[in-house]
Protein backbone atom coordinates (compact mmCIF):
# COMPACT_ATOMS: atom_id res chain seq x y z
CA UNK A 1 0.00 0.00 0.00
CA UNK A 2 1.26 3.47 -0.89
CA UNK A 3 1.22 6.00 1.92
CA UNK A 4 1.45 9.81 1.52
CA UNK A 5 4.72 9.75 3.46
CA UNK A 6 6.85 6.61 3.45
CA UNK A 7 8.62 7.72 6.62
CA UNK A 8 7.78 10.14 9.42
CA UNK A 9 10.54 11.41 11.70
CA UNK A 10 9.15 12.73 14.99
CA UNK A 11 11.46 14.91 17.10
CA UNK A 12 10.46 15.92 20.63
CA UNK A 13 12.43 18.89 21.94
CA UNK A 14 11.86 17.90 25.55
CA UNK A 15 10.24 20.78 27.50
CA UNK A 16 10.38 23.41 24.72
CA UNK A 17 6.91 24.87 25.34
CA UNK A 18 5.53 27.91 23.54
CA UNK A 19 3.37 29.76 26.05
CA UNK A 20 0.96 29.11 28.89
CA UNK A 21 -1.73 26.56 28.14
CA UNK A 22 -5.43 27.38 28.46
CA UNK A 23 -5.53 25.73 31.90
CA UNK A 24 -2.14 27.00 33.13
CA UNK A 25 -3.72 28.66 36.16
CA UNK A 26 -4.81 25.27 37.51
CA UNK A 27 -1.12 24.29 37.55
CA UNK A 28 0.09 27.65 38.96
CA UNK A 29 1.84 28.29 35.65
CA UNK A 30 0.28 31.58 34.53
CA UNK A 31 2.67 33.57 32.36
CA UNK A 32 4.95 30.65 31.58
CA UNK A 33 6.55 30.72 28.12
CA UNK A 34 9.64 28.56 27.80
CA UNK A 35 10.70 29.62 24.30
CA UNK A 36 10.11 33.35 24.77
CA UNK A 37 11.80 33.58 28.16
CA UNK A 38 14.70 31.36 27.10
CA UNK A 39 15.46 33.45 24.03
CA UNK A 40 15.08 36.88 25.65
CA UNK A 41 18.52 38.52 25.61
CA UNK A 42 19.99 35.78 23.38
CA UNK A 43 22.15 37.43 20.73
CA UNK A 44 22.26 34.69 18.09
CA UNK A 45 19.57 34.00 15.52
CA UNK A 46 17.89 30.69 14.71
CA UNK A 47 17.70 30.83 10.91
CA UNK A 48 16.57 27.26 10.30
CA UNK A 49 13.74 27.16 12.83
CA UNK A 50 12.79 30.62 11.55
CA UNK A 51 12.46 29.53 7.93
CA UNK A 52 10.41 26.52 9.01
CA UNK A 53 7.96 28.90 10.69
CA UNK A 54 8.62 28.71 14.44
CA UNK A 55 8.21 32.48 14.71
CA UNK A 56 4.82 32.26 12.99
CA UNK A 57 3.39 30.22 15.88
CA UNK A 58 3.96 32.94 18.49
CA UNK A 59 6.00 36.16 18.70
CA UNK A 60 9.51 35.20 19.82
CA UNK A 61 12.82 36.98 20.37
CA UNK A 62 15.41 36.34 17.60
CA UNK A 63 12.94 34.22 15.57
CA UNK A 64 10.98 36.38 13.16
CA UNK A 65 7.72 35.60 11.43
CA UNK A 66 8.28 34.70 7.77
CA UNK A 67 5.96 35.32 4.83
CA UNK A 68 6.25 31.80 3.41
CA UNK A 69 7.31 29.25 6.03
CA UNK A 70 8.66 25.95 4.76
CA UNK A 71 6.76 23.90 7.35
CA UNK A 72 3.11 23.63 8.31
CA UNK A 73 2.78 25.06 11.79
CA UNK A 74 0.46 25.21 14.79
CA UNK A 75 0.46 24.80 18.56
CA UNK A 76 -1.40 22.19 20.61
CA UNK A 77 -2.72 22.09 24.17
CA UNK A 78 -2.58 19.14 26.55
CA UNK A 79 -5.78 17.33 27.50
CA UNK A 80 -4.21 14.99 30.08
CA UNK A 81 -4.04 16.07 33.70
CA UNK A 82 -0.25 15.87 34.11
CA UNK A 83 2.65 17.93 32.78
CA UNK A 84 5.40 15.31 32.96
CA UNK A 85 7.38 13.63 30.21
CA UNK A 86 5.50 10.33 30.19
CA UNK A 87 2.08 11.98 30.13
CA UNK A 88 3.08 14.31 27.29
CA UNK A 89 4.59 11.55 25.18
CA UNK A 90 1.72 9.13 25.81
CA UNK A 91 -0.76 11.80 24.76
CA UNK A 92 1.26 12.52 21.61
CA UNK A 93 0.67 8.87 20.68
CA UNK A 94 -3.05 9.01 21.31
CA UNK A 95 -3.79 8.54 25.01
CA UNK A 96 -5.59 10.86 27.43
CA UNK A 97 -4.14 10.36 30.91
CA UNK A 98 -6.73 11.26 33.55
CA UNK A 99 -4.79 10.08 36.62
CA UNK A 100 -1.63 12.14 37.09
CA UNK A 101 1.67 10.61 38.06
CA UNK A 102 2.90 11.86 41.40
CA UNK A 103 6.00 13.93 42.06
CA UNK A 104 7.74 14.17 45.41
CA UNK A 105 9.42 17.57 45.89
CA UNK A 106 9.85 16.83 49.62
CA UNK A 107 11.00 13.23 49.23
CA UNK A 108 9.00 10.02 49.47
CA UNK A 109 6.51 9.39 52.30
CA UNK A 110 7.64 7.53 55.41
CA UNK A 111 5.19 4.72 54.65
CA UNK A 112 6.83 3.96 51.29
CA UNK A 113 10.33 4.27 52.72
CA UNK A 114 9.46 1.76 55.44
CA UNK A 115 8.00 -0.66 52.88
CA UNK A 116 11.22 -0.49 50.86
CA UNK A 117 13.36 -1.02 53.97
CA UNK A 118 11.26 -3.95 55.20
CA UNK A 119 11.26 -5.57 51.77
CA UNK A 120 15.00 -5.23 51.12
CA UNK A 121 16.47 -5.40 54.61
CA UNK A 122 18.45 -2.28 53.75
CA UNK A 123 18.09 1.24 55.13
CA UNK A 124 17.06 4.12 52.85
CA UNK A 125 19.15 7.31 52.93
CA UNK A 126 18.99 10.71 51.18
CA UNK A 127 15.30 10.63 50.12
CA UNK A 128 15.06 14.01 48.42
CA UNK A 129 15.21 15.59 44.96
CA UNK A 130 18.79 15.87 43.72
CA UNK A 131 21.02 15.46 40.70
CA UNK A 132 22.50 11.99 40.44
CA UNK A 133 26.13 13.09 40.52
CA UNK A 134 25.49 15.37 43.50
CA UNK A 135 23.71 12.73 45.58
CA UNK A 136 26.43 10.13 44.91
CA UNK A 137 29.18 12.59 45.88
CA UNK A 138 27.27 13.28 49.08
CA UNK A 139 26.21 9.76 50.08
CA UNK A 140 28.48 7.44 48.07
CA UNK A 141 31.07 6.83 50.77
CA UNK A 142 28.35 6.24 53.37
CA UNK A 143 26.69 3.75 51.04
CA UNK A 144 29.96 1.84 50.59
CA UNK A 145 30.38 1.53 54.35
CA UNK A 146 26.78 0.61 55.23
CA UNK A 147 25.14 -0.96 52.18
CA UNK A 148 22.24 1.48 52.53
CA UNK A 149 20.16 2.43 49.49
CA UNK A 150 20.60 5.96 48.16
CA UNK A 151 17.04 6.87 47.16
CA UNK A 152 16.32 10.17 45.44
CA UNK A 153 13.94 11.80 42.99
CA UNK A 154 13.67 14.81 40.66
CA UNK A 155 10.97 17.11 39.36
CA UNK A 156 9.72 14.14 37.31
CA UNK A 157 7.67 11.23 38.77
CA UNK A 158 10.72 9.00 39.27
CA UNK A 159 12.28 7.05 42.14
CA UNK A 160 16.00 6.43 41.65
CA UNK A 161 18.13 4.00 43.65
CA UNK A 162 21.91 4.39 43.59
CA UNK A 163 24.37 1.82 44.91
CA UNK A 164 28.05 1.00 44.43
CA UNK A 165 28.47 -2.04 42.18
CA UNK A 166 31.03 -3.58 44.57
CA UNK A 167 28.66 -3.22 47.53
CA UNK A 168 25.32 -4.20 46.01
CA UNK A 169 25.81 -6.42 42.94
CA UNK A 170 23.92 -5.37 39.83
CA UNK A 171 21.53 -8.32 39.93
CA UNK A 172 20.53 -7.48 43.50
CA UNK A 173 20.05 -3.80 42.65
CA UNK A 174 17.90 -4.75 39.66
CA UNK A 175 15.87 -7.14 41.81
CA UNK A 176 15.30 -4.38 44.38
CA UNK A 177 14.14 -1.99 41.65
CA UNK A 178 11.75 -4.58 40.21
CA UNK A 179 10.17 -5.03 43.64
CA UNK A 180 9.93 -1.27 44.20
CA UNK A 181 8.32 -1.01 40.76
CA UNK A 182 5.55 -3.34 41.92
CA UNK A 183 5.11 -1.43 45.19
CA UNK A 184 4.75 1.91 43.44
CA UNK A 185 2.05 0.82 41.03
CA UNK A 186 -0.27 1.45 43.97
CA UNK A 187 -2.43 4.50 43.05
CA UNK A 188 -1.45 6.21 46.31
CA UNK A 189 2.16 6.38 45.03
CA UNK A 190 1.83 6.10 41.19
CA UNK A 191 5.44 6.77 40.25
CA UNK A 192 6.21 6.76 36.54
CA UNK A 193 9.67 5.18 36.56
CA UNK A 194 11.98 3.37 38.95
CA UNK A 195 15.62 3.78 37.90
CA UNK A 196 18.61 1.68 38.99
CA UNK A 197 21.63 3.99 39.18
CA UNK A 198 24.79 1.93 39.83
CA UNK A 199 28.13 3.66 40.28
CA UNK A 200 31.79 2.74 40.77
CA UNK A 201 34.96 4.41 42.03
CA UNK A 202 36.29 5.76 45.29
CA UNK A 203 35.22 8.71 47.47
CA UNK A 204 35.84 11.94 45.59
CA UNK A 205 35.97 10.08 42.28
CA UNK A 206 32.66 8.27 41.85
CA UNK A 207 31.22 7.75 38.36
CA UNK A 208 27.85 6.39 37.30
CA UNK A 209 28.09 3.38 35.01
CA UNK A 210 26.23 2.49 31.84
CA UNK A 211 24.38 -0.24 33.76
CA UNK A 212 21.45 2.08 34.47
CA UNK A 213 18.13 0.32 34.07
CA UNK A 214 14.66 1.87 33.89
CA UNK A 215 11.52 0.17 35.16
CA UNK A 216 8.68 2.11 33.60
CA UNK A 217 4.96 1.66 33.55
CA UNK A 218 3.44 0.46 30.33
CA UNK A 219 1.14 3.01 28.67
CA UNK A 220 -2.42 2.85 30.02
CA UNK A 221 -3.78 1.76 26.64
CA UNK A 222 -2.79 1.00 23.06
CA UNK A 223 -0.88 3.75 21.32
CA UNK A 224 -0.38 4.57 17.65
CA UNK A 225 3.02 2.89 18.00
CA UNK A 226 1.31 -0.42 18.84
CA UNK A 227 -0.87 -0.09 15.74
CA UNK A 228 2.15 0.64 13.54
CA UNK A 229 4.14 -2.31 14.87
CA UNK A 230 1.17 -4.66 14.54
CA UNK A 231 0.87 -3.61 10.89
CA UNK A 232 4.54 -4.37 10.21
CA UNK A 233 5.80 -0.79 10.09
CA UNK A 234 9.14 0.14 11.61
CA UNK A 235 9.03 2.09 14.88
CA UNK A 236 12.58 3.21 15.63
CA UNK A 237 12.92 4.70 19.12
CA UNK A 238 15.92 7.00 19.62
CA UNK A 239 17.02 8.31 23.01
CA UNK A 240 14.73 7.74 25.98
CA UNK A 241 11.66 6.98 23.83
CA UNK A 242 11.97 3.23 24.44
CA UNK A 243 11.99 3.81 28.21
CA UNK A 244 9.06 6.25 28.10
CA UNK A 245 6.83 3.64 26.44
CA UNK A 246 8.46 0.67 28.20
CA UNK A 247 9.22 -0.81 24.78
CA UNK A 248 5.54 -0.95 23.77
CA UNK A 249 5.16 -0.60 20.01
CA UNK A 250 8.92 -0.29 19.45
CA UNK A 251 10.68 -2.37 16.78
CA UNK A 252 14.20 -0.98 17.30
CA UNK A 253 15.70 1.01 20.19
CA UNK A 254 18.79 3.21 19.88
CA UNK A 255 20.41 4.81 22.94
CA UNK A 256 21.88 8.32 22.91
CA UNK A 257 24.35 10.23 25.10
CA UNK A 258 23.05 13.78 24.59
CA UNK A 259 21.19 16.03 22.14
CA UNK A 260 23.92 16.14 19.52
CA UNK A 261 24.42 12.39 19.68
CA UNK A 262 20.65 12.09 19.27
CA UNK A 263 20.82 14.15 16.08
CA UNK A 264 23.74 12.03 14.86
CA UNK A 265 21.75 8.85 15.48
CA UNK A 266 18.64 10.29 13.78
CA UNK A 267 20.58 11.37 10.69
CA UNK A 268 22.14 7.91 10.50
CA UNK A 269 18.65 6.35 10.68
CA UNK A 270 17.40 8.71 7.96
CA UNK A 271 20.21 7.57 5.65
CA UNK A 272 18.97 3.97 5.81
CA UNK A 273 15.87 2.67 4.07
CA UNK A 274 12.82 1.80 6.17
CA UNK A 275 9.06 2.29 6.17
CA UNK A 276 7.41 3.70 9.27
CA UNK A 277 8.53 6.18 11.90
CA UNK A 278 11.61 7.25 13.77
CA UNK A 279 10.93 8.89 17.13
CA UNK A 280 13.64 10.94 18.85
CA UNK A 281 13.60 12.61 22.26
CA UNK A 282 16.15 15.36 22.89
CA UNK A 283 16.28 15.39 26.68
CA UNK A 284 19.06 17.92 27.38
CA UNK A 285 16.74 20.93 27.02
CA UNK A 286 14.80 19.63 30.02
CA UNK A 287 17.32 17.72 32.12
CA UNK A 288 20.37 19.96 31.81
CA UNK A 289 18.82 23.39 31.43
CA UNK A 290 15.10 23.62 32.19
CA UNK A 291 15.10 21.99 35.62
CA UNK A 292 18.31 23.80 36.51
CA UNK A 293 16.83 27.12 35.37
CA UNK A 294 19.86 27.67 33.14
CA UNK A 295 18.43 30.15 30.65
CA UNK A 296 21.70 30.76 28.78
CA UNK A 297 22.51 27.07 28.46
CA UNK A 298 18.96 26.38 27.28
CA UNK A 299 19.17 29.05 24.56
CA UNK A 300 22.52 27.73 23.35
CA UNK A 301 21.10 24.20 23.19
CA UNK A 302 18.30 25.46 20.94
CA UNK A 303 20.92 27.17 18.76
CA UNK A 304 22.92 23.93 18.58
CA UNK A 305 19.78 22.06 17.48
CA UNK A 306 19.00 24.73 14.89
CA UNK A 307 22.45 24.28 13.37
CA UNK A 308 21.85 20.55 12.85
CA UNK A 309 18.62 20.98 10.87
CA UNK A 310 20.22 21.58 7.42
CA UNK A 311 22.09 18.27 7.65
CA UNK A 312 18.89 16.48 8.58
CA UNK A 313 16.90 18.15 5.81
CA UNK A 314 19.61 17.46 3.20
CA UNK A 315 19.34 13.73 3.92
CA UNK A 316 15.55 13.50 3.67
CA UNK A 317 13.78 11.64 0.90
CA UNK A 318 11.13 13.48 -1.09
CA UNK A 319 8.33 11.54 0.61
CA UNK A 320 9.62 12.01 4.18
CA UNK A 321 7.84 14.09 6.80
CA UNK A 322 9.61 15.62 9.81
CA UNK A 323 7.53 16.67 12.82
CA UNK A 324 9.25 18.87 15.40
CA UNK A 325 7.37 19.35 18.66
CA UNK A 326 7.65 19.24 22.49
CA UNK A 327 5.99 17.40 25.38
CA UNK A 328 5.47 20.17 28.00
CA UNK A 329 7.18 23.37 29.10
CA UNK A 330 10.01 24.05 31.55
CA UNK A 331 10.27 27.82 31.74
CA UNK A 332 13.77 28.71 32.99
CA UNK A 333 12.52 31.83 34.79
CA UNK A 334 9.55 30.15 36.51
CA UNK A 335 9.67 29.65 40.29
CA UNK A 336 10.96 26.29 41.51
CA UNK A 337 12.33 23.57 39.26
CA UNK A 338 9.19 21.89 37.91
CA UNK A 339 7.73 21.66 34.41
CA UNK A 340 5.26 24.29 33.21
CA UNK A 341 1.84 23.75 31.64
CA UNK A 342 2.23 25.11 28.12
CA UNK A 343 1.21 24.77 24.52
CA UNK A 344 3.66 22.78 22.42
CA UNK A 345 4.88 24.02 19.02
CA UNK A 346 4.35 21.78 16.02
CA UNK A 347 6.28 22.10 12.75
CA UNK A 348 5.61 19.61 9.93
CA UNK A 349 8.16 19.71 7.10
CA UNK A 350 8.34 17.65 3.92
CA UNK A 351 10.57 18.37 0.91
CA UNK A 352 7.62 17.82 -1.42
CA UNK A 353 5.39 20.30 0.41
CA UNK A 354 7.75 23.07 1.53
CA UNK A 355 6.33 25.54 -1.02
CA UNK A 356 2.74 24.84 0.07
CA UNK A 357 3.08 25.09 3.85
CA UNK A 358 0.68 27.18 5.93
CA UNK A 359 -0.85 27.45 9.39
CA UNK A 360 -2.91 24.52 10.67
CA UNK A 361 -5.87 24.85 13.02
CA UNK A 362 -4.63 24.19 16.53
CA UNK A 363 -7.84 23.81 18.52
CA UNK A 364 -6.95 20.25 19.42
CA UNK A 365 -4.69 18.15 21.65
CA UNK A 366 -1.22 16.60 21.54
CA UNK A 367 -2.89 13.44 20.20
CA UNK A 368 -3.33 15.11 16.82
CA UNK A 369 0.31 14.28 16.16
CA UNK A 370 -0.40 10.58 16.67
CA UNK A 371 -3.62 10.87 14.68
CA UNK A 372 -1.70 12.37 11.74
CA UNK A 373 0.82 9.52 11.85
CA UNK A 374 -1.92 6.87 12.09
CA UNK A 375 -3.86 8.46 9.23
CA UNK A 376 -0.75 8.49 7.04
CA UNK A 377 -0.08 4.77 7.52
CA UNK A 378 -3.77 3.81 7.43
CA UNK A 379 -3.81 2.20 10.86
CA UNK A 380 -6.58 2.71 13.46
CA UNK A 381 -6.75 6.32 14.60
CA UNK A 382 -6.55 7.13 18.31
CA UNK A 383 -9.72 8.07 20.15
CA UNK A 384 -8.34 11.56 20.73
CA UNK A 385 -6.88 14.13 18.36
CA UNK A 386 -7.42 14.94 14.71
CA UNK A 387 -5.26 14.21 11.67
CA UNK A 388 -3.75 17.20 9.89
CA UNK A 389 -3.35 15.42 6.54
CA UNK A 390 -6.49 16.86 4.93
CA UNK A 391 -5.54 20.39 6.03
CA UNK A 392 -2.12 19.80 4.49
CA UNK A 393 -3.91 18.88 1.22
CA UNK A 394 -2.19 15.51 1.23
CA UNK A 395 -3.87 12.95 -1.00
CA UNK A 396 -4.25 9.43 0.37
From Swiss-Prot:
Keywords: Cytoplasm, Isomerase, Manganese, Metal-binding
Chain sites annotated for binding Mn(2+) 2: 286, 291, 339
InterPro entries: Alkaline_phosphatase_core_sf, DeoB, Metalloenzyme, Phosphopentomutase_DeoB_cap_sf
Entry EC number(s): 5.4.2.7
Molecular-function GO terms, alphabetical: magnesium ion binding; manganese ion binding; phosphopentomutase activity
Cellular localisation: Cytoplasm
BP terms from Gene Ontology: 2-deoxyribose 1-phosphate catabolic process; 5-phosphoribose 1-diphosphate biosynthetic process; metabolic compound salvage; nucleotide metabolic process
Cofactor(s) the protein needs: Mn(2+)
Ligand binding (Mn(2+) 1): 14, 327-328
Pathway where this protein functions: Carbohydrate degradation; 2-deoxy-D-ribose 1-phosphate degradation; D-glyceraldehyde 3-phosphate and acetaldehyde from 2-deoxy-alpha-D-ribose 1-phosphate: step 1/2
Cofactor note: Binds 2 manganese ions.
Top-rank taxon, per record: Bacteria
Reactions performed catalytically: 2-deoxy-alpha-D-ribose 1-phosphate = 2-deoxy-D-ribose 5-phosphate; alpha-D-ribose 1-phosphate = D-ribose 5-phosphate
Cellular component terms per the entry's GO annotation: cytosol
UniProt xrefs under HAMAP family: Phosphopentomut
Function: Isomerase that catalyzes the conversion of deoxy-ribose 1-phosphate (dRib-1-P) and ribose 1-phosphate (Rib-1-P) to deoxy-ribose 5-phosphate (dRib-5-P) and ribose 5-phosphate (Rib-5-P), respectively.
Protein family according to the UniProt entry: Belongs to the phosphopentomutase family.
Protein name: Phosphopentomutase
Lineage of the organism: Bacteria, Bacillati, Bacillota, Bacilli, Bacillales
Recorded name of the encoding gene: deoB
Amino acid sequence: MTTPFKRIHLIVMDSVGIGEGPDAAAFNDEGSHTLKHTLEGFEQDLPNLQRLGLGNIAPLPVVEEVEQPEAFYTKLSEASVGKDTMTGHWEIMGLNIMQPFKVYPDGFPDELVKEIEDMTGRKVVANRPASGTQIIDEWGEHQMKTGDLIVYTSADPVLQIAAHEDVIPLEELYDICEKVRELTKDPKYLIGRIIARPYVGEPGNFTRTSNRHDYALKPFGRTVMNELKDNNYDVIAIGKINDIYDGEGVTEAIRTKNNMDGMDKLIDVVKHDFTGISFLNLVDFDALYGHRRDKEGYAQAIKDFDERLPELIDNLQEDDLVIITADHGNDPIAPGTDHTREYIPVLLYSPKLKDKAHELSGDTTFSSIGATIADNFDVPLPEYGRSFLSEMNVEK
